[in-house]
């Protein structure tokens, strides 16, 4: 009996839009939810990209380190194949944002604990911050879900800023696809300035993951979705690898044409 021919390996994405890099020497915030006992330096991340045929990467600001952005900025200076998001004080000046943009920073990540109140979204300080980000050509990256996301996205609708929602919109919170966050996310996508990351699927119920991805592909389309590995899988290192993160992508977005369109959209968005 003739053995079935081996299928070709899936084409890897061109860009990983969500990963963290750090060393143990970096200062942790007082409220850090975990304290990694290992380093994941930029050199290790780049080696991971190379090993899997991925050309570009986006370093995502991690809550563990607050607004300590020094390591990411140093990585950007050395590696032009990278972009980064940072965390910033809302009082950051337009000049500082322009300098960060020139350095390869493409956006600012916003996240707060799930039970914490949002800032005054209609107040001067917040609106000034968002306006300055938009003027600098940066986006706002939202690591929010549920009611928090449901309240945040409508407040940004008239501010002219692009938004990227992390990790499927944290669908594990408040009702999943029937909750306020998912509904607001779909409405924001329809307005044309919001994208969603197909990332950190290992943090969601495995039995629901494919359905979440299918629904987002149906309503948003691949041009509004980015893939991110969430390497080095903080808190889940024992059960996740970079290869498994890619295999998850291939499983939940099975059409290579959809994956290619996702890559093309991310390359355009992150200005590669």
Give residue spans per PLM region:
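Active-site gating/metal-coordination segments in enzymes
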Residues: 66-147, 195, 200-203
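Conserved, mostly hydrophobic/aromatic
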Residues: 18, 49, 72, 100, ...
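Mid-to-C-terminal alpha-helical segments outside catalytic/metal-binding sites
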Residues: 1-13, 38-56, 215, 221-226, ...
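Alpha-helical scaffold segments that flank or form the walls of functional sites
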Residues: 32-60, 65-78
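Catalytic pocket-lining loop regions of alpha/beta-barrel enzymes
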Residues: 122-227
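Active-site environment of divalent metal-dependent phosphoester hydrolases
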Residues: 22-25, 64-67, 91-92, 115-116, ...
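Short, acidic/polar
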Residues: 39-48, 91-100, 180-181, 212
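Hydrophobic faces of well-ordered beta-strands that scaffold small-molecule active sites
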Residues: 15-19, 57-60, 83-86, 108-110, ...
């Amino acid at each position: 009996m003739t053995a079935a021919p081996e299928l070709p390996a899936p084409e890897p994405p061109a860009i990983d839009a969500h990963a963290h890099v750090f060393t143990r020497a970096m200062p942790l915030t007082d409220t850090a939810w975990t304290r990694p006992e290992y380093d994941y330096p930029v050199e290790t991340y780049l080696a991971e990209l190379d090993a899997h045929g991925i050309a570009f990467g986006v370093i995502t600001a991690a809550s563990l380190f607050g607004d300590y952005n020094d390591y990411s900025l140093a990585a950007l200076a050395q590696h032009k194949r990278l972009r980064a998001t940072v965390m910033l004080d809302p009082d950051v000046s337009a000049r500082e944002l322009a300098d960060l943009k020139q350095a390869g920073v493409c956006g600012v990540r916003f996240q707060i604990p799930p039970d914490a109140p949002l800032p005054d979204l209609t107040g001067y300080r917040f609106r000034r911050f968002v306006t300055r980000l938009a003027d600098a050509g940066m986006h706002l990256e939202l690591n929010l879900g549920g009611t928090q996301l449901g309240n945040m996205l409508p407040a940004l609708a008239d501010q002219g800023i692009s938004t990227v929602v992390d990790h499927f919109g944290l669908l594990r919170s408040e009702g999943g696809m029937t909750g306020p966050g998912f509904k607001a996310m779909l409405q924001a996508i329809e307005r044309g300035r919001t994208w969603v990351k197909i990332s950190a699927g290992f943090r969601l119920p495995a039995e629901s993951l494919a359905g979440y991805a299918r629904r987002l592909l149906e309503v948003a389309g691949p041009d509004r979705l980015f893939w991110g590995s969430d390497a080095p899988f903080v808190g889940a290192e024992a059960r996740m690898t970079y290869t498994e993160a890619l295999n998850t992508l291939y499983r939940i977005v099975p059409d290579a044409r959809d994956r290619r369109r996702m890559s093309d959209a991310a390359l355009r968005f992150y200005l590669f």
